[in-house]
Design a protein with these regions (language model features):
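Bacterial N-terminal signal peptides
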Residues: 6-18
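Acidic, polar low-complexity linker/tail segments
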Residues: 20-45, 51-59, 152, 180
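VWA/integrin I-like adhesion module and closely mimicked acidic/polar interface patches used
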Residues: 79, 165-215
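Von Willebrand factor A/integrin I-like adhesion domains
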Residues: 191-252
Length: 317
């Protein structure tokens, strides 16, 4: 079940719940006994899809949404409400198995000044696009960033955004399960601004990317998704999602993720759709009936041979 409640009502709830919170402790806290790193309330990795399935307007709206969310009143109040009154954040963009680029390295946010600096880093970076969609590699890359974090917090969240299923690299459920075993939480921002395929070449379009994220991508205590259904909704949805993550809140209507239940959307649908387009296999189904493992993704050599062709004709890469 997707989250359909009013984003505005959630923002009001966040503001109300944090207004009565005490000021953060004046002395530095240590998140883990014996850990000498500066303490924060949350370690947050933001993983942003820049594959060719994302329209240029959506890429721009996504960038602007994160930059504005980080300096918003709701986000900063949620930050101040924590025991340490600060969080650590890093922001990277991803597409294929080998394409992850850090836009903002680990930064501490403890007030408007630090937030403005991070927002400026995001907006000043050139907008780019990449081929293929490897959510699994994005999750693995995000998990590795926590080991490089100069700050230490009791909660670690990977915030993944995207508009298509995994079609490259390891199965997304494998990467998800490994991250959950490491104590990480994965939340999702499925982008649904294109409700129908824009062209015959949009071969990786699926009707319910929100279901896919709920059943195949997110996981861990308090994980949730906030779908974006129109371009005008980017800023508000991202602001709400980040404030919820920092405050440690979960929408009441958000599904309780379970890695044991039968998914409503085949978790290997992206790999199957890719093979149908570039290889010869049996047509895929968008439902859970097809439970056989997907054929392996095209090799790196095949990827390279197809790359120019993909960039020219394919939105769903």
């Amino acid at each position: 079940m997707s989250w359909q409640i009013s984003i505005g009502s959630i923002l009001i709830a966040i503001l109300t719940s944090t207004q009565a919170c005490p000021e953060p402790a004046s002395q530095p806290l240590t998140a883990t006994q014996g850990d000498s790193r500066p303490a924060v309330d949350l370690e947050l990795v933001i993983a942003v899809d820049v594959s060719y399935s994302m329209e240029p307007d959506d890429l721009a709206a996504q960038r602007e949404g994160y930059a504005k969310a980080i300096v918003s009143q709701e986000f900063l109040r949620a930050v101040r409400a924590g025991p340490a009154g600060k969080i650590a954040l890093t922001y990277f963009e991803w597409s294929s198995t080998s394409d992850q680029k850090i836009v903002v390295p680990w930064r501490q946010i403890d007030g408007p000044g630090a937030a403005e600096a991070v927002a400026t880093e995001i907006t000043n970076a050139p907008i780019r696009r990449g081929s293929r969609t490897s959510i699994s590699s994005a999750i693995k890359f995000a998990a590795s960033l926590f080991e490089q974090n100069p700050y230490s917090g009791p909660r670690r969240i990977i915030d993944v955004s995207g508009d298509g299923p995994n079609s490259n690299g390891d199965p997304v459920t494998s990467a998800r399960d490994t991250a959950l075993q490491q104590g990480l939480v994965i939340t999702g921002l499925p982008v649904m601004t294109n409700a129908t395929p824009a062209a015959p070449t949009d071969f990786q379009h699926i009707d319910h990317i929100d279901w896919y994220y709920e059943d195949c991508v997110i996981g861990g205590p308090g994980s949730f998704v906030v779908p974006i259904t129109n371009r005008e909704n980017f800023e508000e949805a991202i602001r709400t999602k980040l404030a919820l993550e920092v405050a440690g809140l979960t929408p009441k209507q958000s599904p309780a993720p379970s890695t044991d239940k039968e998914p409503r959307v085949l978790c290997t649908i992206g790999e199957k759709l890719w093979q149908e387009r570039w290889g010869a296999i049996t047509p895929a189904s968008n439902g859970p009936a097809m439970s056989k493992p997907a054929a392996s993704s095209p090799s790196s050599k095949e990827d390279a041979l197809l790359d120019k062709k993909i960039k020219g004709i394919c939105r769903g890469c």
